Regions:
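Mid-domain catalytic core of redox enzymes
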Residues: 128-238, 242
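Active-site/ligand-binding neighborhood in enzyme catalytic cores
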Residues: 4, 14-138
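Short glycine- and Lys/Arg-enriched binding-loop motifs that mark or flank ligand-binding interfaces
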Residues: 104, 141, 249-252
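Short acidic-glycine loop/turn motifs at beta-strand connectors
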Residues: 2-3, 199
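Surface-exposed flexible segments
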Residues: 82-89, 155, 262-273
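A structural signal for the hydrophobic beta-strands that form the central parallel beta-sheet
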Residues: 124-126, 143, 251
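Conserved flavin/dinucleotide-binding core of flavoenzymes
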Residues: 13, 193-294
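Short capping micro-motif at the N-terminus of alpha-helices
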Residues: 8-10
């Protein structure tokens, strides 16, 4: 931001550096109270949520431009819940999560998925799209593809964002951290990921990084992020209502349930869905189309 590197999510270090002060936690709380727009009692969108709880200056510097790039929308068009996921701390903890335990698979997600699909009872077919006729081949289907695509977009296409990646190879260290966000609207990419920092116990002479460019997901693109807009919920509800009436199929994952999910939640819900299915078999009950609230 403005040629400087700041700590995110916003914490005491960020506040002191950005405003050029040396606040204690209590002083920082008082400072932000002065910056916040207290006239916004019930924030109705992302922008109002930001103005109410962090103030205009921090919002403009760290969130406005980044949000426009990431979602292709002005923050006033996004629900307040999008910002509620991001913590603001009045200490020097710059961790995004408050979980008791954090981690990644020891050998990475690629190896984890590889181990799953190599199971003797799992067959993988590439370059083959799912069709409704295939449902008769199975007792039950778990569908993790896009919800609207399952119905051939009969009511219209739901909104998604997709990503383009530009690879950077550096012979040493590139940025000194795993992920760095670029908040300015003038920088076309949203962030750069330097993957070796996710596994600091490894030693690498070179480094591979990727710039991420977010854009609207069009036909033929890979959908990454569901865009849940308040003015588009009628279309989503049409698909959800129809899906809930289905038999012998369960919609799962980020695309199947049309929700923004972190990886830990995705895995936890997959395990939960498996438990629900096994219980339904044991008790001879009907398996629901959704095992989570959508």
């Amino acid at each position: 931001v403005n040629g400087q590197v700041f700590s995110l999510p916003i914490n005491l270090h960020t506040i002191n550096q950005f405003f050029g002060v040396a606040c204690s936690p209590d002083d920082a709380r008082k400072l932000l109270l002065q910056k916040c727009d207290s006239t916004i009692l019930e924030p109705q969108n992302f922008e109002q949520q930001a103005l109410r709880f962090i103030g205009e200056e921090l919002y403009e510097a760290f969130f406005k431009g980044y949000t426009i790039k990431q979602w292709g929308l002005h923050p006033s068009a996004l629900p307040a819940s999008v910002l509620k996921r991001i913590p603001v701390r009045f200490n020097y903890n710059d961790n995004y999560f408050n979980h008791k335990f954090q981690g990644i698979p020891k050998f990475g997600y690629t190896q984890m998925v590889k181990s799953i699909v190599e199971h003797e009872n799992i067959a993988v077919e590439l370059c083959r799209s799912f069709t409704q006729e295939m449902r008769t081949d199975y007792d039950h289907v778990f569908f993790s593809g896009a919800l609207d695509a399952f119905y051939s977009c009969q009511y219209g296409r739901l909104e998604y964002r997709t990503l383009d990646f530009k690879k950077i190879i550096c012979q040493s260290d590139y940025q000194g951290c795993a992920v760095m966000n670029y908040c300015s609207i003038d920088t076309p990419y949203t962030r750069i990921t330097e993957h070796k920092y996710f596994s600091p116990w490894e030693r690498h002479e070179a480094s591979i990084c990727y710039q991420e460019y977010s854009r609207e997901c069009e036909a033929g693109d890979i959908p990454y992020y569901p865009v849940r807009r308040a003015d588009k919920m009628d279309l989503l509800n049409k698909y959800l209502s129809r899906a809930k009436k289905e038999k012998n199929i369960t919609f799962i994952g980020r695309l199947g349930t049309y929700r923004y999910l972190d990886m830990d939640i995705t895995i936890a819900e997959a395990l939960q869905t498996a438990d629900v299915y096994l219980t339904s078999l044991y008790e001879q009950k009907e398996m629901p189309a959704f095992t989570v609230t959508v």
